[in-house]
């Protein structure tokens, strides 16, 4: 998949601008604060209808404006078709359209545009809260399979209902019904995550060796308080027993203490937890390796390259590692890379410079 053009209006610090993109490497540049990250954020927004910087929608609307607008034209190479995706944001909500038709639900929209994003804060992926790593797994798996997204949404709904039942001290029969349903919808989530982490172990270490060139081995585990079993009946029976053991504890704390909503993806470098013992450089390259690995998985499962979005990835890499990264990403159909300078053959790169006349300098940007 590739993006052919992007149009933004009243998005962050952009007044109005449009850019043409090409297959291969696209380098987005400009003065500091011109809005390089803002443009990548707009493109990524057309994948999940939310900012990869966790900003609320109201912060994406330019100062003194009532709405923001983004439109992208995408080409799906494997199936030979183009799609137009639009997002209109107001202070009261948002609307997503695909080929002029309003997307009724998030699940009907996610997976239309495939992107994989690396942004500077991912350096702290394995130092951050487990929720950030669960989010990364969930977004990747939702892009691969709409059934996963449906199961995830169903799980979250039942989880809210069960937590509410615990808060209101509902009787055991009501909690038991919700427990059985929670176990049922959790099974495909756990199985999909386990499969993803198994593949990540192979691909992640491969990319880490390519970029870092060391003998250190990168591996991943799934830290869970659920039951790891690929048989649904066995899983259900053991999970019921698990919940029974936690029954009094959950009643006291009035919240669900078991399930994939509390699980974690943990990285190890030479058998030491990366988040605790790894240097910032090792954490950066490990997080970048995860990004490339997940992009490769999407390509294999969907038969289509995701658009690889790399925001300010070069700034803390030495010249040798920059070259290794540029060599590595050549395998992807389209890469969007932001930065201030790039030591690469100009003929191989589509350079997009953000000019000062299309942005509000006083609001700034990245």
Task: Indicate residue ranges for each PLM-predicted region.
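Walker B catalytic acidic pair
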Residues: 311-313
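Nucleotide-state sensing region of NTPase/ATPase domains
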Residues: 48-126, 130-132, 138-144, 148, ...
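Structural recognition of the conserved hydrophobic beta-strand(s) that form the central parallel beta-sheet
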Residues: 72, 334-341
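Conserved NTPase motor "head" modules and their coupling/switch loops across ABC/AAA+ ATPases, GTPases
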Residues: 1-31, 173-307, 316, 320, ...
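Long, charged N-terminal accessory/stalk domains
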Residues: 124-126, 131-176, 180-183
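Conserved lysine of the Walker
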Residues: 36
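Helix-to-loop junction immediately C-terminal to a conserved catalytic motif
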Residues: 44
């Amino acid at each position: 998949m590739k993006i052919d053009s992007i149009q933004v209006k009243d998005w962050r610090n952009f007044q109005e601008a449009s850019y043409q993109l090409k297959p291969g490497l696209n380098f987005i540049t400009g003065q500091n604060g011109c809005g390089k990250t803002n443009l990548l954020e707009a493109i990524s927004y057309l994948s999940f209808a939310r900012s990869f910087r966790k900003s609320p929608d109201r912060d994406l609307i330019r100062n003194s404006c009532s709405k923001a607008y983004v439109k992208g034209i995408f080409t799906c190479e494997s199936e030979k078709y183009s799609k137009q995706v639009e997002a209109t944001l107001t202070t009261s909500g948002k609307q997503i359209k695909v080929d002029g038709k309003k997307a009724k639900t998030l699940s009907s929209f996610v997976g239309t545009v495939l992107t994989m994003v690396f942004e500077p804060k991912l350096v702290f992926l394995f130092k951050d809260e487990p929720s950030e790593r669960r989010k990364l797994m969930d977004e990747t798996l939702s892009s691969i399979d709409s059934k996963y997204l449906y199961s995830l949404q169903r799980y979250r709904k039942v989880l809210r209902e069960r937590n509410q039942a615990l808060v209101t001290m509902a009787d055991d029969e009501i909690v038991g019904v919700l427990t059985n349903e929670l176990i049922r919808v959790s099974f495909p989530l756990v199985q999909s995550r386990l499969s993803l982490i198994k593949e990540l172990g192979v691909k992640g270490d491969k990319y880490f060796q390519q970029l870092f060139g060391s003998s250190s081995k990168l591996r991943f585990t799934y830290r869970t308080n659920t039951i790891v079993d690929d048989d649904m009946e066995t899983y259900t029976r053991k999970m019921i027993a698990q919940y029974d053991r936690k029954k009094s504890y959950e009643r006291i704390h009035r919240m669900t203490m078991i399930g994939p909503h509390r699980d974690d993806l943990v990285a190890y470098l030479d058998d030491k937890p990366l988040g605790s013992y790894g240097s910032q450089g090792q954490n950066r390259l490990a997080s970048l390796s995860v990004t490339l690995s997940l992009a490769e998985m999407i390509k294999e499962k969907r038969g289509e390259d995701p658009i690889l979005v790399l925001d300010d990835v070069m700034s803390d890499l030495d010249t040798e590692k920059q070259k290794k990264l540029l060599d590595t990403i050549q395998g992807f159909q389209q890469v969007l890379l932001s930065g201030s300078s790039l030591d690469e053959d100009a003929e191989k790169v589509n350079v997009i410079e953000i000019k000062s006349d299309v942005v509000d300098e006083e609001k700034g940007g990245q």
